[in-house]
Amino acid sequence: MSESNNTPLLLRAARGEKVERTPVWMMRQAGRYMKIYRDLREKYPSFRERSENPDLAIEISLQPWHAFQPDGVIMFSDILTPLPGMGIPFDIIESKGPIIENPIRTQAQVDAMTPFDPAESLPFIKTILGTLRQEVGNASTVLGFVGAPWTLAAYAIEGKSSKNYAIIKNMAFSEPAVLHSFLGKIADAIADYVCYQIECGAQVIQMFDSWAGQLSPQDYDMFALPYQKRVVDKVKAKYPDFPLILYISGSAGVLERMGKSGVDIVSVDWTVDMADARQRLGKDMKVQGNIDPGVLFGSQDFIKARIIDTVRKAGNWGHILNLGHGVLVGTPEDNVRFFFETCKNVQSFL
């Protein structure tokens, strides 16, 4: 068997190899738009149970695989999953999202953080990733993921989702030393978590800095980029050839800066035209994205046209097709099926 037949398509594209077609997966491809997931959620209402009980997390991760055969199967988890292992417990309330009862507001709390040992605090990750690898074999690429330091710090400091990030920005601009100390600790823990996911079987890992798009470019350079880079540098020192993706929501203002983090692939959201993203990131940077998730509410002809447009603009090297954000609740499952089907046959439409 040749190397290309042995190695999954998305992994080859992530490594920068020439591939026979553009690989495709979707952020949040396992989730609430699928009836099979909603039925399981009725039975197991706790999000943490669904994501930390290996049998449930494996079943959920594989739901879109069985339905649509995407080129990437991402483990069902949450970016906050490692926080309890750092001494920051959280819960996820269905209608409210994540809640952290004792948000981090002082240097004393930062100093009291627990040393993070992923094998000890997250043993279920090994089971989930290992089983996913066995289940999909070489037919798909298994993706892991982590939250980036700024975004995890934002949750831990705000205590919940925020519209204006006033509490973390207050700390950033009035007590920057406390925030830098916290970000450094998170970066080191997340680097260890990435390495652990690699050792457990992940083949590509995406780092979500979901809230970094809320920073001005100069503050991104101060509070987000150095800690993204710290994670990447630590991982690359141990696993230099492992493909890493960086995703930021609302990243138009910091796109070039994302490329400076050291990642292999920049995941572009839909607020940037893919042709512009290619130009701004340079010919050597691989890209992922970037169809507006709302497109999947449109007609199938409309969906097909947007797929063709994105693939044309991205070109035939170093592109992983994806949405510019997670698939939206209420998206018709048949349109998701059509999306994957069309993506896999897109070469015949070009």
UniProtKB/Swiss-Prot annotation:
Assigned EC number: 4.1.1.37
SUPFAM superfamilies: UROD/MetE-like
Pathway: Porphyrin-containing compound metabolism; protoporphyrin-IX biosynthesis; coproporphyrinogen-III from 5-aminolevulinate: step 4/4
Positions with a binding annotation for substrate: R28, Q29, A30, G31, R32, D78, Y155, S210, H325
GO process terms (BP): protoporphyrinogen IX biosynthetic process
Gene transcribed to yield this protein: hemE
GO molecular function: uroporphyrinogen decarboxylase activity
Annotated site residue numbers, Transition state stabilizer: D78
Organism for this UniProt entry: Picosynechococcus sp. (strain ATCC 27264 / PCC 7002 / PR-6)
Protein location: Cytoplasm
Pfam families: URO-D
Main location class: cytoplasm
Family, as annotated: Belongs to the uroporphyrinogen decarboxylase family.
InterPro entries (UniProt xref): UROD/MetE-like_sf (IPR038071), Uroporphyrinogen_deCO2ase_HemE (IPR006361), Uroporphyrinogen_deCOase (IPR000257)
This protein's name: Uroporphyrinogen decarboxylase
